[in-house]
């Protein structure tokens, strides 16, 4: 882990959350950075709860509304990564609303793609209650149905 990743995980950068851009920075450090630095290990998901809490708290007072549409995509990703049906529903609603806001703009297809990706995540959680592609990494036993799903092309992210 890099020093900013460790500092964010330890709560040392909590003051950043006082401003929308700082809150987004913390979300990126806790959600995206671990997924890329620690891909294939449990550490990739270790800060998900913290990132999700920052996202949800920010949503409660509209912190996302002060960000650009593309920045909001990253603000919402902790919900898309959640193994929770409720949070997946919220993710889809947010991404669909964002796509609707961009419906007349030049990035329409890009934002429709983000909404589609959120829906794909939601379908998996609705069916399994978790992301089967994380099972081996997190030491969870896969069900026969999950194993069959994982053998399908395009089943992972």
Where are the predicted features?
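Structural motif
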Residues: 14-24, 63-70
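Short, small-residue-biased leader/transition segments that mark boundaries at the very start
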Residues: 2-3
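Helix-adjacent hinge/juxtasegments
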Residues: 29, 36-66
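A contiguous pocket-lining binding segment that forms or flanks enzyme active sites
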Residues: 52-103
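Conserved interaction-surface patches within small, structured recognition/assembly domains
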Residues: 7-19, 35-39
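Amphipathic alpha-helical regulatory regions
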Residues: 22-33
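Short alpha-helical scaffolding segments that buttress acidic/His motifs in well-ordered protein cores
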Residues: 28, 74-78, 118
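C-terminal accessory segment of soluble enzyme catalytic cores
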Residues: 100-157
């Amino acid at each position: 882990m890099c020093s900013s990743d460790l500092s964010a995980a330890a709560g040392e950068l909590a003051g950043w959350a006082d401003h929308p851009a700082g809150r987004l920075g913390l979300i990126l450090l806790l959600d995206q950075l671990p997924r890329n630095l620690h891909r294939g290990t449990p550490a990739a998901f270790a800060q998900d709860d913290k990132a999700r809490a920052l996202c949800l708290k920010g949503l409660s007072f509209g912190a996302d509304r002060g960000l650009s549409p593309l920045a909001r995509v990253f603000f919402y990703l902790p919900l898309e990564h959640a193994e929770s049906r409720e949070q997946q529903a919220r993710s889809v609603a947010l991404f669909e609303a964002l796509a609707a806001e961009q419906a007349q703009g030049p990035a329409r297809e890009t934002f429709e793609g983000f909404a589609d990706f959120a829906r794909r995540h939601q379908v998996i959680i609705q069916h399994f209650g978790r992301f089967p592609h994380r099972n081996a990494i997190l030491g969870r036993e896969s069900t026969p149905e999950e194993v069959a799903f994982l053998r399908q092309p395009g089943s992972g992210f």
